[in-house]
């Protein structure tokens, strides 16, 4: 019983950390802010995580894993090009731009990677390799998949930076049309 409660509490903390990470990056939110968003006090934090970096890294890797799982759930009959088109249609949408619930964490973190612990860069590198393989039509198509990923991430980051509006919408449409 106690382990279930502890696991549920840990999951609430991770959900709050994930939302904070997407909104403000991994460095800015304090432990107090994350715990408050989870409806908890700071005092219980260290029963679940050894540090703020450990919390944010776990939230980051969970979010990345969810992205890959959503692509794994796509029809296996789709070609890499068709998968990239479907991913781009969602990834470069207003809904994804304006969402913080299950949004991709990369646009919020890519600018901070140089200042984060190496474990973040390692997790990102692994994710990029795995995603490129998922989105490639063949092993020879991996560079095209990497280019499209860079375009989608950069397009979404710019659209989010611009905020909702016509220019932001144009950035999303332009990036989406460039992904082939």
What are these regions (language model features)?
Residues 1-7:
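N-terminal intrinsically disordered/low-complexity leader segments
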Residues 12, 20-54, 58:
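Helix-turn-helix
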Residues 12, 82, 86, 90, ...:
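Amphipathic alpha-helical interaction segments
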Residues 58, 72-102:
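Hydrophobic alpha-helical connector segments
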Residues 65-68, 85, 101-103, 113-140, ...:
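Amphipathic alpha-helical packing segments from all-alpha helical-bundle domains
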Residues 92-96, 106-115:
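Helix-loop "lid/cap" segments that line or gate small-molecule binding pockets
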Residues 117-125, 137-180:
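Hydrophobic/aromatic-rich alpha-helical bundle segments in the mid-to-C-terminal region
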